[in-house]
Amino acid sequence: MTNLNKLYTLYGVDTRKEKDALKDLLTNHLPKEYTRMVINKLELKGVQVDSQTVRNTKGGISKNLLIFSAIVEVAKEYKIISNQFKEQLKT
C-alpha cells in the first residue's frame, strides 16, 4: 500500500500542486503490472532491481530516487495513453 505522506517527505514533494500530481499518478494511472515495467525500464539503463525493491520504494519503505523516478515515468506513460483513449471515445 502506498503511504503518500511518507513519499512526499522522502522525495521532497512540498507544494499542493506537486502532491496532487503525484497522488493522481500513483493512484489513478499506475498499472497493476507496474513492477515488471519498472524493472524492464531500469534494465535498459543497466540497473538490476527485483520486484520487492520496486514495491518497497513505491510504498515508502525504502528510498531510491532512480526506482521512484521510473515508477513515476510508467505512471505518466499510462496517463498519456488513458487520455488519448478518452479523446478517441469522444470522436
Language-model segments: residues:
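Polyanion-binding surface elements
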Residues: D20-E43
